[in-house]
């Protein structure tokens, strides 16, 4: 009887121990599978070297106060100072309690609020990818470099690096972004009363292997931050859809709501598996 009880107890302990081993092994395998799948998705869209062996740079646009320009430069570009402008207190800040302060402001460059929002979306998204770190850099600094993966925020009229990328021969789609997006197929997209427009374009970096160039820009400030939100939240899906291929996605963004960004036009060669899934989905409708 004692031997039987001992055998039952031993079998119970062995079963519990083996179950724990299987549970832990399954958990670790699942985590490893998630990690490798996420890493592969990240590398397909941002490049195999991005954020590890080379920089992953979020390039911020900057603008300057025209009142600081010398008179000859203002005259050249057709800008006149407003009457009675005060160069010592150029900006104001309104507080919730109603009081207002005046400040000189920066003497060199200003960062648009939409670019700050966009950078925050991207940095938060990349924090979830193990081993990946992103840095922000001003467009003036980034314009001197090509070694790295660059994500630019702002149009070619406010971000020097966006202008550099727009003028690459590898850009097969975007002609210009001055007031409207004009494309090489002859189409154009403009801002509507309630909707800004955004654009996410990815090119493979022609100057270095394993790195990419991505533009997040907008017609209207919500177009810029909305496009950055779209990339930050949808990069895994974009990776499945396009693989390593270049692409351009045009977006419509409700003013005041970055998370409303939705696709209205797309260019690029989709992965064959994505096309097959889309075909079967349409066939079943």
Regions found by a protein language model. Give the residues of each.
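Solvent-exposed alpha-helical segments and adjacent loops
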Residues: 32-285
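Hydrophobic, helix-forming membrane-interacting segments
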Residues: 1-38
């Amino acid at each position: 009887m004692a031997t039987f009880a001992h055998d039952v107890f031993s079998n119970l302990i062995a079963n519990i121990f083996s179950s724990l081993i299987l549970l832990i092994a399954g958990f670790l395998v699942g985590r490893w599978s998630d990690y490798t799948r996420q890493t592969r998705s990240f590398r397909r869209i941002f490049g195999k070297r991005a954020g590890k062996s080379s920089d992953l740079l979020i390039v911020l646009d900057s603008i300057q106060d025209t009142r600081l320009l010398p008179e000859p430069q203002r005259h050249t570009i057709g800008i006149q100072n407003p009457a009675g402008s005060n160069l010592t207190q150029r900006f104001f800040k309104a507080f919730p309690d109603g009081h207002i302060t005046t400040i000189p402001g920066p003497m060199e460059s200003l960062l648009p609020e939409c670019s700050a929002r966009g950078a925050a979306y991207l940095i938060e998204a990349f924090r979830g990818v193990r081993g990946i770190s992103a840095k922000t850099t001003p467009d003036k600094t980034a314009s001197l470099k090509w070694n790295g993966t660059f994500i630019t925020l702002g149009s070619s009229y406010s971000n020097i690096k966006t202008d550099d990328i727009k003028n690459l021969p590898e850009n097969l789609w975007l002609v210009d972004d001055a007031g409207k997006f004009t494309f090489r197929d002859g189409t154009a997209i403009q801002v509507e009363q309630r909707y800004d427009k955004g654009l996410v374009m990815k090119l493979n970096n022609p100057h270095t292997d394993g790195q990419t160039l991505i533009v997040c820009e907008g017609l209207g400030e919500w177009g810029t931050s909305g496009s950055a939100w779209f990339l930050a939240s949808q990069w895994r899906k974009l990776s499945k859809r396009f693989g390593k291929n270049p692409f351009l996605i045009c977006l419509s963004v409700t003013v005041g709501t970055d998370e409303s960004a939705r696709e209205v036009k797309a260019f690029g060669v989709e992965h064959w598996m994505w096309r097959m899934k889309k075909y079967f989905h349409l066939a079943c409708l």
